[in-house]
Amino acid sequence: MSPQTETKAGVGFKAGVKEYKLTYYTPEYETKDTDILAAFRVTPQPGVPPEERGAAVAAESSTGTWTTVWTDGLTSLDRYKGRCYHIEPVPGEEEQFIAYVAYPLDLFEEGSVTNMFTSIVGNVFGFKALRALRLEDLRIPVAYVKTFQGPPHGIQVERDKLNKYGRPLLGCTIKPKLGLSAKNYGRAVYECLRGGLDFTKDDENVNSQPFMRWRDRFLFCAEAIYKSQAETGEIKGHYLNATAGTCEEMIKRAVFARELGVPIVMHDYLTGGFTANTTLSHYCRDNGLLLHIHRAMHAVIDRQKNHGMHFRVLAKALRMSGGDHIHSGTVVGKLEGERDITLGFVDLLRDDYIEKDRSRGIYFTQDWVSLPGVLPVASRGIHVWHMPALTEIFGDDSVLQFGGGTLGHPWGNAPGAVANRVALEACVKARNEGRDLAVEGGEIIREACKWSP
């Protein structure tokens, strides 16, 4: 037991406020394979030493509080406390530094992303001694990874279910997102799927509104799926959004989707919450449904560069909680992202083992062992002229999701879908023949236009 937690007969309990760094700053600490490691970007209030602020983050996100309490003597803080074990400056930012914190695995409930985030980020972000705080990355130890089911099926099983290999999958979000009747909505789904897309999608805020109740939408979309499958000979799907006000209602919608025989449902995992998401993920694995994940509300959390959480942390959490697809940004299009950083967390979604690479924003080596991978979804503001870049950047294991880039075609929905499919097939064929998509992409698309709407 450490001197800070030890109580001795005859001495009595010594109350009072102590500097955090006396207990929680331990630069000599050697991290364990079972520790959860966190990298925080810290912007402290003026005049506060980095060691004290880094230790404060470790304390307030683990066992600490603002004062010494007598019940410290009833446990072992050395076993349970978080430790700030390293501090480094942020290049180009005089007032910021990266604090590395190690958390003992016993602080976390098995298989619960909810508990993990409640512990690590649930309270410390309101700490007034900090001007701003951002969680840049987490290292999830193998011992903790193995307590999660992860994605319901994963990349390979999805390809086997769809019988589609050797190319990215194509999707489309039905527009306008709100206001269509269920029958007209189903018609748009049918036209897009018949034209050559693999999937169509409910927008994130399509749940069960007065203009289109969920059950009606599910029925008309299922009819569209079966009709397009019969005409094309391909397996098709529509992301039926099961997100609801309660977990019970969400599962009821997923059950109805399964009874209709459709292949995939959808969830808004941040607004719906990690407990709901994990519940739905378990249901999907048990019942053969794929699970598409939308990240609605992510920018509230990850957009600020010095406060909140980076999306790579949310992506890791989703892989643990469970989802077969997740929107990941495009690098091109109207929501352009930093290419290397985006591909860094795309690899964290898909690959089994990812080495530390600070140039791509990856602070820790991550081993996912047997946890299935997640397909990244590139969407928003993309169209056929982006197809060469998207095919080159994201590779085969991805979903390319066109909304206005399909439905905005001057000839209608089905020709828009045909144009997307022809462009994709042309890019994949050219790539397989050894042509450089980055250099010849425009020419490849122009050649494809001769055979497409």
From Swiss-Prot:
Q: Any idea where this protein resides? A: Plastid, Chloroplast
Q: What is its main location?
A: plastid
BP GO terms, sorted: photorespiration; reductive pentose-phosphate cycle
Q: Which residues carry this modification: N-acetylproline?
A: P3
Which positions does UniProt annotate for Mg(2+) binding?
A: K201, D203, E204
User: What is written in the cofactor note of this entry?
Assistant: Binds 1 Mg(2+) ion per subunit.
**EC assignment:** 4.1.1.39
Q: Which CDD domains match?
A: RuBisCO_large_I
Positions of the pro-segment in this chain: 1-2
State the needed cofactors, names only: Mg(2+)
Q: Which UniProt keywords apply?
A: Acetylation, Calvin cycle, Carbon dioxide fixation, Chloroplast, Disulfide bond, Lyase, Magnesium, Metal-binding, Methylation, Monooxygenase, Oxidoreductase, Photorespiration, Photosynthesis, Plastid
Q: What class of enzyme is it?
A: lyase
Q: Which SUPFAM superfamilies match?
A: RuBisCo, C-terminal domain, RuBisCO, large subunit, small (N-terminal) domain
Instruction: List residue numbers at the site (Transition state stabilizer).
Output: K334
| Note in the entry | The basic functional RuBisCO is composed of a large chain homodimer in a 'head-to-tail' conformation. In form I RuBisCO this homodimer is arranged in a barrel-like tetramer with the small subunits forming a tetrameric 'cap' on each end of the 'barrel'.
Q: Which family does it belong to?
A: Belongs to the RuBisCO large chain family. Type I subfamily.
Q: Which HAMAP family match?
A: RuBisCO_L_type1
Q: How does it assemble?
A: Heterohexadecamer of 8 large chains and 8 small chains; disulfide-linked. The disulfide link is formed within the large subunit homodimers.
Name of the protein in question: Ribulose bisphosphate carboxylase large chain
Q: Tell me which species this is from.
A: Galium aparine (Catchweed bedstraw)
What taxonomic lineage is listed for the species of origin?
Answer: Eukaryota, Viridiplantae, Streptophyta, Embryophyta, Tracheophyta
Q: Which gene encodes it?
A: rbcL
